[in-house]
């Protein structure tokens, strides 16, 4: 059901809830004046020409580093500067470590055992410890480096069959990431090169789930309507989750029946810790979903920025030639490629894959920068606005990788002007894998191929429009014509 129809058909019911749930707090953060019944929804969803993340960044310039928006009956607090982010992610990290869960993702099979969406329970702490110390530990990642190198080599080889043709870069990068993750999870590929449609495959199902989760949901604004699922979004998401689970159901059963003590992928670790099927399914889904989509979006942005900036592309290739020569890039080469790493950081700064990070929730009422943040408010950190804040960055809209060579700013969570992976106890647990995989793929692509644009378009003509779904994607998707480099 269309969101607008759902809203207007329920105005009488909504009015009752509005009257019962009028804000009781004083000294709230500044923000645009809310309309009766619908709060600030018109500001956010009526201007379709400007993406939401840009609208909110512009609003922060008016209302300040901490502002409040009313989405229907629900307060959402937005932090839009490095100082405000530090208050949320460090000073009050315990209070804001709770999660605001998207309604579409509140699946009965999933939330109880979720690493991404559950609150900081004892189970969550145990799961996070296992992931950090056994699955994404330096030792485990090092042991699997040859697998990632092999999967990237398969991408490079496949692109030779597409030489001279128009290629949507995200399609095959996403598939490569799925295969890397498939081998992390249960030592199997899940994507087949040459299957252009992937109909019913994991790639399409994962992307469909993420798109459904990103759709505006009337129940987000009026939670009392959640059980009605008026738009059918939770049902659609649940159906796809069940279909995805069936894809690895046989693998899990086979592994249980034939345990190999020498094998050490994610499935082995979970079985060794006596995880049940529901726990395994929840972690598998979160590994394949956010892990593949955010890295794919980042890689696409880096390639686009380098195509549009020939001088920077030439510097990356010069560095690769000096370090790698005619050899294949290995993960062990990555620490010796600072300019490549700087280009990736710069693309992350300009186009963070998760521009609001993942939504948090105020576990209790507290005070931030002199303002009252009500209990159960959704709390967002606008990493996009922070990455383009002129108070933190010189020429913030310019792609200038050298800025990261001239400073010690990194993305590990201690520098709040640059937090693409978040910070605090909710820092992305997949960061150690992403920071190996992304430069390996980007470096391999630009080292092996020149990328022309369809129709003979020039680099300066490349459109860099942004589209916000659950991730920040380039719009339209980057299409290139690969040509093998001599």
UniProtKB/Swiss-Prot annotation:
Belongs to the cytochrome P450 family. One of its GO terms (molecular function) is monooxygenase activity. GO terms for cellular component: endoplasmic reticulum membrane. It comes from Coptis japonica. CDD domains: CYP76-like. Pfam families: p450. Its cofactor is heme. Heme binds at residue 428. Its EC number is 1.14.19.51. It is an enzyme of class 1 (oxidoreductase). Coiled coil: none annotated. This is Corytuberine synthase.
């Amino acid at each position: 059901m269309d969101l607008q129809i759902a809203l207007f058909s329920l105005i009488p019911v909504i009015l009752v809830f509005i009257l019962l749930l009028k804000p009781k707090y004083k000294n709230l953060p500044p923000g645009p004046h809310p309309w009766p019944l619908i709060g600030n929804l018109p500001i956010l969803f009526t201007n379709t020409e400007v993406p939401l993340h840009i609208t909110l960044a512009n609003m922060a310039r008016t209302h300040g580093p901490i502002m409040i928006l009313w989405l229907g009956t629900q307060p959402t607090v937005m932090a839009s500067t490095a100082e405000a982010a530090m208050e949320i992610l460090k000073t009050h990290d315990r209070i804001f470590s709770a999660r605001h869960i998207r309604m579409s993702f509140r699946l009965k099979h999933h939330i109880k055992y979720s690493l991404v969406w559950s609150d900081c329970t004892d189970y969550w702490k145990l799961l996070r410890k296992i992931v950090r110390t056994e699955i994404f530990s330096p030792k485990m990642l090092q042991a699997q480096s040859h697998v990632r190198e092999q999967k990237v080599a398969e991408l490079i080889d496949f692109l030779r069959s597409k030489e001279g043709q128009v290629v949507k870069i995200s399609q095959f990068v996403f598939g490569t990431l799925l295969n890397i993750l498939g081998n992390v999870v249960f030592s199997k590929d899940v994507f087949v090169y040459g299957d252009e449609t992937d109909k019913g495959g994991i790639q399409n199902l994962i992307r469909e789930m993420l798109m459904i989760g990103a759709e505006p949901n009337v129940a987000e604004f009026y939670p009392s309507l959640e059980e009605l699922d008026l738009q059918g979004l939770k049902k659609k998401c649940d159906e796809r989750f069940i279909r995805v689970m069936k894809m690895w159901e046989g693998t899990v059963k086979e592994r249980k029946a034939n345990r190999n003590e020498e094998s050490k992928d994610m499935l082995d670790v979970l079985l060794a810790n006596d995880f049940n099927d529901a726990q395994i399914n929840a972690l598998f889904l979160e590994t394949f979903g956010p892990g593949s989509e955010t890295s794919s979006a980042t890689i696409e942005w880096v390639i686009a920025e380098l195509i549009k900036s020939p001088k920077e592309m030439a510097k990356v290739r010069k560095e690769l030639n000096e370090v790698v020569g005619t050899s294949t890039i290995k993960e062990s080469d990555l620490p010796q490629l600072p300019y490549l790493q700087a280009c990736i950081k710069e693309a992350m700064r300009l186009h963070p894959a998760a521009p609001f990070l993942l939504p948090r929730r105020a576990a209790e009422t507290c005070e931030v920068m002199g303002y009252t943040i009500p209990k159960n408010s959704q709390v967002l950190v606008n990493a996009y606005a922070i990455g383009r804040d002129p108070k933190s960055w010189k020429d913030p809209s310019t792609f200038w990788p050298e800025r990261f060579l001239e400073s010690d700013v990194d993305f590990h969570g201690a520098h709040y002007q640059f937090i693409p992976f978040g910070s605090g106890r909710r820092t992305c647990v997949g960061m150690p894998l992403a920071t190996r995989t992304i430069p390996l793929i980007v470096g391999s692509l630009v080292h092996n191929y020149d990328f022309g644009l369809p129709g003979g378009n020039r680099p300066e003509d490349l459109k860099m429009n942004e589209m916000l779904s659950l991730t920040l994607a380039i719009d339209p998707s980057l299409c290139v014509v690969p040509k093998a480099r001599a």
